[in-house]
Swiss-Prot record:
Enzyme class, spelled out: hydrolase
Species: Proteus mirabilis
UniProt-annotated binding residues for Mn(2+): H128, D151, H153, D155, D232, D234
Gene3D superfamilies documented for this protein: Ureohydrolase domain
Pathway membership: Amine and polyamine biosynthesis; putrescine biosynthesis via agmatine pathway; putrescine from agmatine: step 1/1
NCBIfam families recorded: agmatinase, PRK02190.1
Biological role: Catalyzes the formation of putrescine from agmatine.
GO molecular function, one term: agmatinase activity
Gene that encodes the chain: speB
Protein name: Agmatinase
Length: 306
């Protein structure tokens, strides 16, 4: 239907714009809203190299988030984020199906418009390629940033196509969007280049080291730069997140990931995304629930500063 989607565009998708995260009402005029943070879904998986299906991720995250909406003074924060932070869900980005360039251009423009209006952005993928246009928009507004990146893969591979969910963090430093010397990749457990400047905290050491020790190192690496936080759900072990396109065994537990995430509160996080939830491969919605919980704790990170 027309006039009931982001940008007042006709959306013929069967999987977009169903309901808001955490039962937030959908707001299709986010630029003029009084929101502090705006949630946008990007149902895109054309850049996937393995199993597709992450286009259904935003819907799955929103649907399972209703299980989290009832809790007021949420554990372990002991306050209600909704009383401190104004959050709206503006639904899903509308773009031409089958046109990756159109998605990229529209996501960047949408994000730039939100940032110019004084909003901050939490984005649900979709595959991880969506982070690149998000970084382009944020870098225009904040300048070069530090990247805090949870993933099983570094996504710094130089041999991919223009639209590839494994190449974003090869292109981003080359475009001057992020500073690898002040960026950290967490949970990595696949082959990667060790000479590109990123600090890699591989899954083995993350699983063996304590949270306080790890977070102290992350804070030291990031320094005072504005931070973009991106969480690929395959950072988690497949026992906790089977519903993703490129699962890799030996990953983080949800407990370890959440404890690390919650400890990042002092960082100057200016943008966030949660990507690669693919519900077709999920079991009992545990991947979507992990994603929704991580996204909610991302918002609590911001509310805790109020």
């Amino acid at each position: 239907m027309k006039n009931c989607t982001l940008g007042n565009e006709t959306d013929n998708s069967l999987i977009s714009n169903a309901f808001g995260f955490l039962r937030f009402p959908l707001n299709f005029q986010p630029y003029s809203s009084d929101a502090d943070w705006v949630i946008t879904g990007v149902p895109f998986d054309m850049a996937t190299s393995g199993r597709a299906g992450t286009r259904h991720g935003p819907g799955a995250i929103r649907q399972i988030s209703t299980n989290l909406a009832w809790e007021g003074h949420r554990w372990p924060w002991h306050f209600d984020m909704r009383e401190r932070l104004k959050v709206v869900d503006c639904g899903d980005l509308v773009f031409n199906f089958g046109d990756a360039q159109d998605m990229s251009d529209k996501l960047q423009a949408h994000t730039e418009k939100l940032l110019a209006a004084g909003k901050r952005c939490l984005t649900f993928g979709g595959d991880h390629f969506v982070t690149l246009p998000l970084l382009r928009a944020h870098a225009k507004h904040f300048g070069k940033m530090a990247l805090v990146h949870f993933d099983a893969h570094t996504d710094t591979y130089a041999n991919g196509s223009k639209f590839d969910h494994g190449t974003m963090f090869y292109h981003a430093p080359n475009e001057g969007l992020i500073d690898p010397q002040h960026s950290v990749q967490i949970g990595i457990r696949t082959e990667h280049d060790t000479n590109n400047g990123f600090t890699v905290l591989d899954a083995a050491q993350v699983n063996d080291r304590g949270v306080d020790d790890l977070v102290a190192q992350i804070k030291e690496i990031v320094g005072s730069l504005p931070v973009y936080l991106t969480f690929d759900i395959d950072c988690l072990d497949p026992a906790f997140a089977p519903g993703t396109g490129t699962p890799v065994v030996g990953g983080l537990t949800t407990d370890k990931a959440l404890k690390m995430l919650r400890a990042l509160q002092p960082l100057n996080i200016v943008g966030m995304d949660l990507v690669e939830v693919s519900p077709a491969y999920d079991q009992s919605d545990i991947t979507a629930l992990a994603g929704a919980t991580i996204a909610l704790d991302m918002l609590y990170l911001q509310a805790a500063k109020k």
